[in-house]
Design a protein with these regions (language model features):
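The feature marks the mature, well-folded catalytic cores of soluble enzymes
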Residues: 1-257
Length: 257
């Protein structure tokens, strides 16, 4: 589907013959690719997900090229300290304005987040997010549950940020960059409304990838904001969402050369 729109797609092939990696369908958590062949390997909360770095790194190196590759391995040292930063699940990166947005949680450690931002030149914008579960406020563990960025818009569940100072600071950063804010509800993020990604094809045309469940839960007015500047692609991945716990954004990890 993405290839039909002129988007270059590489698939990391898995096999359980070597190591059991049941969550490898979500590669955006274990690495972050930056321009110039720079690659961050991420410290992962779940021990079995740490195998993905070793198992798939060779395929990734082949894509980026040995000559260009510059690796920053954040994995083992931070995992030994129980400090985690699970890639572009934990961080939403605005690569144009060089800002990194993060909902702090056990899977997004503030110290490691700030270290990443300092090394790669991002301005850190951190906050705390919550959603109501069984009548109580529970921490949101990945930022891409509640937030997504396009070049001209930002999808975010502002009501998930209970601290009004943090909420106002986030809005100020987004509006300061000229992004139109699409404020989604907790019910909508339960349908993966924050789990979207905007991609470009070789001609520079922008596409926003979201699940059918997300498309259906957004209002026509919310979709219209996205469609001003980006064509929506909305495949049905209900089985993955139901049994894997993630959606299309988690399944896509950008490659920058």
């Amino acid at each position: 589907l993405l290839r039909s729109k002129g988007i270059t797609v590489h698939v990391l092939q898995d096999s359980n013959q070597v190591m059991d990696t049941p969550d490898s369908i979500f590669p955006n958590n274990w690495f972050v690719s930056m321009e110039g062949g720079r690659l961050m390997l991420c410290p992962m909360w779940a021990p079995n997900r740490r195998h993905e770095r070793l198992k798939f790194l060779g395929q990734l190196v082949d894509l980026i090229g040995h000559d260009k590759l510059k690796v920053s391995n954040y994995g083992p040292a931070h995992e030994a300290q129980s400090k985690f930063l699970e890639g572009t699940g934990a961080m939403i990166l605005d690569r144009i304005n060089m800002k990194a947005y993060a909902c702090l949680s056990p899977r997004c450690d503030e110290d490691v987040f700030k270290k990443f931002c300092k090394e790669f030149g991002f301005k850190p914008v951190a906050f705390h997010g919550f959603q109501t579960y069984e009548g109580k406020r529970a921490a949101i563990y990945h930022t891409n549950v509640m937030m997504a960025l396009g070049e001209a818009f930002a999808v975010v569940c502002l009501s998930a940020i209970d601290d009004l100072t943090e909420r106002a600071a986030l809005v100020k950063e987004l509006q300061g960059d000229g992004k139109e804010i699409i404020d989604v509800t907790e019910d909508q993020i339960n349908n993966f409304a924050g789990n979207e990604i905007e991609l470009c094809n070789a001609d520079g045309k922008r596409f926003t990838i979201m699940t059918k469940a997300t498309y259906d839960c957004l209002t026509p007015e919310q979709r219209a904001v996205i469609e001003k500047t980006s064509e929506i692609i909305s495949p049905d991945v209900k089985t993955i969402e139901t049994y894997g716990g993630g959606s299309v954004r988690c399944m896509i990890s950008e490659i920058f050369l």
